[in-house]
C-alpha cells in the first residue's frame, strides 16, 4: 500500500506518497526534501518528529522509549507509514529537552 505523508517543517508543509515498505526519511529525500538525520539506524534522535495524525511502524528503531512513542515521537529514518500520516519534523530539541 502507499500512503500520503505530510511533513510539517519549519519551512512549511510538504506532502508526498510513501509506500508502506519505505522509510519516511528515505522517501522524503527521494522527493527532494531535506530533513535532519544522523545515524539513519534508529539509534539517535537527530531525525525525530512528532506524529500529529495517523500511524507509523518504527519497530526497527531502538532509541525511543515507550513513553516517548506514546507521546507521538517518531524517528523518521526507521518509520514506515501504516496510514496517511502527518508528522511535525525537527523535534529533536523537544525530545531531548
Curated annotation (Swiss-Prot):
Which InterPro entries does its entry note?
Answer: 2Fe-2S_ferredoxin-like_sf, 2Fe-2S_ferredoxin-type, 2Fe2S_fd_BS, Beta-grasp_dom_sf, Fd_pln
Q: Which biological process annotations from GO are given for this protein?
A: electron transport chain; ferredoxin metabolic process
Q: Where does [2Fe-2S] cluster bind?
A: 39, 44, 47, 77
Cofactor: how and how many bound: Binds 1 [2Fe-2S] cluster.
* Gene Ontology terms, MF aspect: 2 iron, 2 sulfur cluster binding; electron transfer activity; metal ion binding
Alphabetically ordered keywords of this record: 2Fe-2S, Chloroplast, Electron transport, Iron, Iron-sulfur, Metal-binding, Plastid, Transport
Q: Which cofactor does it need?
A: [2Fe-2S] cluster
2Fe-2S ferredoxin-type domain location: 3-93
Query: Where in or outside the cell is it found?
Result: Plastid, Chloroplast
Q: Name one GO cellular component term.
A: chloroplast stroma
PROSITE patterns listed in its UniProt record: 2FE2S_FER_1, 2FE2S_FER_2
Family of this protein = Belongs to the 2Fe2S plant-type ferredoxin family.
NCBIfam families (alphabetical): fdx_plant
Q: What's its job?
A: Ferredoxins are iron-sulfur proteins that transfer electrons in a wide variety of metabolic reactions.
Protein name per its UniProtKB record: Ferredoxin-1
Species source reads: Hyoscyamus niger
Amino acid at each position: 500500500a502507499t500512503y500520503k505523508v505530510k511533513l510539517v517543517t519549519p519551512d512549511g508543509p510538504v506532502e508526498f506518497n510513501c509506500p508502506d515498505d519505505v522509510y519516511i526519511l528515505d522517501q522524503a529525500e527521494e522527493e527532494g526534501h531535506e530533513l535532519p538525520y544522523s545515524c539513519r539506524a534508529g539509534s539517535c534522535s537527530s531525525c525525530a518528529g512528532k506524529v500529529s495524525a495517523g500511524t507509523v511502524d518504527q519497530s526497527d528503531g531502538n532509541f525511543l522509549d515507550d513513553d516517548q512513542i506514546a507521546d507521538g515521537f517518531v524517528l523518521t529514518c526507521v518509520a514506515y507509514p501504516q496510514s496517511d500520516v502527518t508528522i511535525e519534523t525537527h523535534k529533536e530539541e523537544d525530545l531531548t529537552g
